[in-house]
Structure formats: C-alpha cells, structure tokens
Amino acid sequence: MEEKHLTRAILIGADTGEYDAESSMDELSELAKTAGAEELARVLQKREAYEPATVIGEGKLAEVKELCGSLGAELLIFDCELTASQIRNVEDETDVRVIDRTMLILDIFAGRAVSREGKLQVELAQLKYRL
C-alpha cells in the first residue's frame, strides 16, 4: 500500500484580541489535517494590529523562516485572510508557499469535488478569491 505524502506545514496566527485565537488555531489545525497537511508547529503572536506587510512582526517572521529551515516546512498557513502583497512578502522572505484560511478551505472543496461542474465551480471560486 502506497503511503500518502502529507504537506509539511506551519500554522501562523496573530492574536489581536478580537476573537479566541487559540480556538481558531485549533480549528485551523483540523482544517489543515483535512486538507492533507502535517502540522509541524504553531506560531501565534500577540499584536495590537496586523503588520500591514506581513501580518506578523519582523522578528516573528525571522523566527518562522528559521523554523521553515529546521523543520523542512513546505507550506505556511495563516489563520486570517491575506492580501496578494502579504502572501508575496512572506513567500519572498521564507521561500515557502503561503496560503490563508480561505484558500485552505477552497483547497479542501477542490479535493472533494467529484463532478465536472463541481470541480469547475470550485476552480472558479479559487480564481475569484485569488484576484
């Protein structure tokens, strides 16, 4: 029996006090498992507000970059919605693919779609979201 490769992922969140960040990260972990990701680590930073360029601060981003190298991470999953520039900035800094919570959920739907119409609808939703 062939063993399925799990994508090695680090979960990242910024706790601004707006919601229960720990519960949200637990839910993100379950979503990641459903999508076929192996959680290597969680990084949760308490912040007054999101850093506009990267969501998390410069020092925490450097810590994430180190974790990526030492743990062999292939994916960073953020527990919030990211802009295209935030994704690019974090990817440029870490050399690791970055997705957000919504992209993760759309990936789960894409993996479960069976009919041609269902697959096209999910693909359309993914493309619209990435715009």
Model regions and ranges:
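Extended, highly charged alpha-helical segments
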Residues: 93, 104-131
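N-terminal accessory targeting/assembly segments
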Residues: 1-107
